[in-house]
Amino acid sequence: MASSSSNRSFLHRNANTFLTYPHCPENPEIISQKLWDLVARWNPLYIVCAREAHRDGNMHLHALLQTDKPVRTTDARIFDIEGFHPNIQSAKSVNKVRDYILKEPLAVFERGTFIPRKSCFQGNTPPFPKKNPNKDEIMAHIISHATSKQEYLCLVRKEFPYDWATKLQYFEYSANKLFPDIQEEFISPHPPSSPDLLCNESIKDWLQPNIYQVSPEAYMLLQPTCYTVDEAISDLTWMDNLSSQQMKDQESRASTSSVQQGQGNLLGPEV
C-alpha cells in the first residue's frame, strides 16, 4: 500500500486517462463498467479496455478513459479494482494510445464515442471570463483548464509567443510541476522459476574464505624470506593457532576478572 507521503505527492488531472493493470486476468467489460461508475462525476464519454498476454503467459489490461471534465484527483488508489492497482498516465496522444491498446487484444470492450484529438487546441476549453483579460488572468485560465503537459505548453505558445520563445525552460518547469510524470511499475523480465535458482548463501560464508583469510601465495609476496608454498602454509597455520590461543586467553582473563570484581563487591558480615 502506498505511503501517506506518496499519496500527498500524487496528482492526476486530465480528461484522457491511460491505465495499465499488470497481472490482471479480469474481464475487460467488468473493469470498464466499474471505471465508468468511478468517474461518473466527471461525465465519462468513452472507454476502451483490452486484455493482452505477457510473454510469460500472465494477463494484463490496458484502458483509455475519456471524460467531459478533466479528472482531478490526488488519490493514487482511485482506479483500484478488485485489489488490482493500475499504472496511471495522462494520454498525451489519444489516437496513438487507442491504437496501442488495440494492437493485439485477446478481448476488447468499448463504450461511448471515441474523441480524437489531432492537436492540443481541440477540445472544449471554456472562453476567457473577461473580454480583455490581462496577462495574469490569461495564465491563470490556462493553468485551470489545461488537461495535459502538451496542451499547457501549446496554450502558452498560442497566448504568449514571445515569452514561449525566450522563456521556454520556465514554462516546461511549471508544466512538469502541474503534470508530473508517473513512473511505470517495474515488471521483471525474468519471472520466478521452478525450482528457485536464486543463490541464497549467506554473505559471511563468502567473506571468511575470500576476504578475511590470507592465501599462501599472498603471504609469499609479503614475506621475501618465504620461498615455498609449504613454508607459507606452515607459517599461516602457526599464526592462526597463536591468534586463537591469544583470544582464548583474553576471554579467560576477562571472565576471571569479572568474577573477582563481583566477589570484591560482596557485602561482609555486619559488625
Swiss-Prot record:
PROSITE patterns the UniProt entry points to: CRESS_DNA_REP
Cofactor note: Divalent metal cations, possibly Mg(2+) or Mn(2+).
SUPFAM superfamilies in alphabetical order: Origin of replication-binding domain, RBD-like
Annotated region (Transactivation), positions in chain: 220-229
Coiled-coil region: none
Main location: host cell
Residue window of motif RCR-3: 100-103
Active site: 100
Residue spans of biased composition, Polar residues class: 244-264
Annotated localization: Host nucleus; Host cytoplasm
EC number(s) per entry: 3.1.21.-
Location of the motif RCR-2: 60-62
Enzyme class, broadest EC rank: hydrolase
Residue ranges of the motif RCR-1: 18-21
Any one GO BP annotation for this protein: DNA replication
Positions with a binding annotation for a divalent metal cation: 52, 60, 62, 104
Region Binding to RBR1, annotated ranges: 197-201
Stretch list, region Disordered: 244-271
Essential cofactor(s): Mg(2+); Mn(2+)
CC annotations in GO: host cell cytoplasm; host cell nucleus
Domain topic, free-text comment: There are 3 rolling circle replication (RCR) motifs. RCR-2 may be involved in metal coordination. RCR-3 is required for phosphodiester bond cleavage for initiation of RCR.
The protein's role, per its UniProt record: Implicated in enhancement of V-sense gene expression. Acts a an inhibitor of C-sense gene transcription.
Oligomeric form and interacting partners: Homooligomer. Interacts with host retinoblastoma-related protein 1 (RBR1), and may thereby deregulate the host cell cycle. Part of the C- and V-complexes which are RepA-Rep-DNA complexes involved in the c-sense and v-sense transcription.
The protein's name in its UniProt record: Replication-associated protein A
Organism: Maize streak virus genotype E (isolate Pat)
